[in-house]
Every structure is written in C-alpha cells, then in structure tokens.
Amino acid sequence: MSALKFWVWLTEQNRLGGPARQALLEHFGSPEEVYYAEPGDLLRVEGITADQAQALEKKSLDRAQSILEECARKDIFLLTAQDALYPQRLKNIYDPPLLLYGRGSMPLFDEEAAVAVVGTRSCSPYGIRTAERFGFEMSKQGGLVVSGLARGIDAASQLGALRAGGLTAAVLGCGVDVVYPPENDRLYEDVAASGVLLSEYPPGAEPFGWHFPARNRILSGLCLATLVVEAPEKSGALITAATALEQGRDVFAIPGPLDAEGSVGCNRLIRDGAGLATESWDILREYQSRYPHKLHPDGEKLPPLPKKSEIFYPERSKKPKVASSGLPVINVRRNAEGLTDDQIKVLRILDDKEPMLTDDIALRANVPVRRILSAVTMLEIDGYTRQEGLRKFVRTVEVEDTKE
C-alpha cells in the first residue's frame, strides 16, 4: 500500500490542527504508524485529546485513495514533509504543512533567493506597473518570484517574472486544479508550465476565505523576504508581512504618496522598520553573498509600460501596417515594438495557419521551453500570437524581415 495514502489520510483528519498532526508525526515517525496506533498510544502524545484520539479510529482510506487517483489523472504531484525536495525553510516555520500538492516543476527553494511579492487586489495602475517591473527585474537578476496568483499585485508580479523568462511559483488557497480568480486562467497555466503551483489543499478544494490566512504562512515561509507593493490600512498583504516577521524573514515595502489609500500600509511598514525598496536590487543585494553564483545587479530593465496598461490585454493605440493577407505587419528587423530576441525567434518560426506546440518551437529555436512559454505569453498579450488548444500557438501578424 502506498505510503502516500497515509499522508493524505492524516492531513484529511479535520478534528486535528496542524500542531496536533505534527506532534503525532514526531512521536510515531510516520503517518502509517499513526494510522495503526492504538487509542491508548495516541493519548500518550502531548496535546492529543480524547476526542481527537477517537476521531483517529475512523480508518477508512477511501477518501485518501480517491484524492490520489485524482492527482494521477490531473498530473498533480505530492510532496511530504519527509521528502528530500521539501524545503528546509518551510520545515522551520510554525505549523509547516505536512503535505503539499503541486503542478509543474518543484524548484529547490533552499538554493533560491525567493521573494514573496504581495499586495492589494484593488490596486492602482501604479501598483500594477510597479509589481510587474519588480517581478521582471527580480527574475532577470536571478531571484525567484513567489506570489499567490490573486488578481492585482500578485498577478502583475508573476506576469513580470514570466516576461523575463524566469522561474516563478504560486501558493494557492484552493486546490492546484482550481483556477481562482477565473480570469487568471492563462496565467495559471503559464506558471504551471514555467514553475510550480503549490497548495496544502487537495484537488477540488474551493477558495474558502479561511484558506488564505493559512496559505500566507507557506507563501512567506518559502521565501527569504516578503515585498509589499501596495496595501491599504487593512490589507491582507499586511497579514502576510506580519507572518513573515514572525518567521524571522525580512520584509520590504515600496513607498507611495502620503495621500494614497493603497500606500498607507506600505508607508507604515517602512516607518516601523521594514526595508525600503525602490528597485529590485534593494532586496536581492541582501542575499548576494549567500547566492553569489545566482544574483547579479545588472539584470535587464523592463521596457516602459503604458500608463494605463491592462495586465492581460492592453489595447494598442497605433494602427499597424496591414499585409495583403489582412494581417498586421511586424518588422522584426527594425523592431520598433521592442520585442526580445526570443519573441522574434518565435514569430519567425510560427505559422499563421497551422498551430505549433511550444515544445516544437523550443526545439527549432534551440531555446529552453520555459523561455518560449514566456515569449509566446507576451506575444499573445500584445496580440501577435493566439493560443489554439493546449500549448499550441499560431502567429496573428505578418512578419517582415527587412531594414526598410
């Protein structure tokens, strides 16, 4: 019988809090030993009540088996607290999750300069631009951007990391198969393809409000620092910052106008001792001596964004030249659009009729898949490509490759 089944069984014991599960695991050594323990032995564990011991007498593994089967169907991996890939940083926090569900590729968090980027969902255009810039530049400088995939600041920072072709991770307050909020569906898929989606909740778990404060301890616990981009006085981002401080992590904040509601929380954090960040290197320089082979201050800067950019589909103000085919023309030699080298390679390879898999594009371009995913994401945002099925894209512009 798979040992994972017992891990799922233990984490699904709703009468037990995280500390109680942790105490049982430390006492018995494994969830399987907890499963087979006698009631009298359970009661010898400090903090375990008679009611909790009685609840553990329910030995059905049907729910656990169902969850494992669903994970297999949906390509979801499980990471236990005893797994070699489980981050030591997370083990060291109060109430570490015994089990993580994931989609994508799990980074070695202990070897990464990971920074949690958080802020209000009801953010200003300035907050969006700033979060995207920090996400982009932090990735270019070798950092790992971690966020919660919420609308607003979270989404903008992760979009910035994807634009940079960097790794990114999201910690969810629902199952990793649940897209929340729904408008982040493409961003959700791109994060899973370029990094990892993580949750302590099983597949299908809904985004209940009480999940998110619990999620925040994982978000900050995986990281060396938490950056608050924009936060009103009672923002949930301030809860994440407080949790980070309790975990002994660094906290940074971006200053804002004194009369801006979204800057009240950030300015207060700075007043109370948080690090002031006006550029991403203000944060990453703190960890350069620890990760000299990864972190460098000369990363590429994000090109200027329009004042009122949309996160996903900015409107284009100029009417482009139109080819006889009816498609807009993009001259990749002049590159007035400021495309990256990877984006230009993608446009040269893609067809305007036959969809091509990102894996095939990467093979032809001789570029890693995660960089191709970043390139096609940004090209789609700009309206130069269109997704046709799972990770298949077509070009929606005519490519001109001349100097004139």
Regions found by a protein language model. Give the residues of each.
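Glycine-biased, small-residue-rich flexible motifs in mid-sequence functional cores and linkers
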Residues: 2-4, 72-73, 80-404
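Short, small/acidic-rich helices and loops at N termini and domain boundaries
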Residues: 1-85, 384, 389-391, 399-404
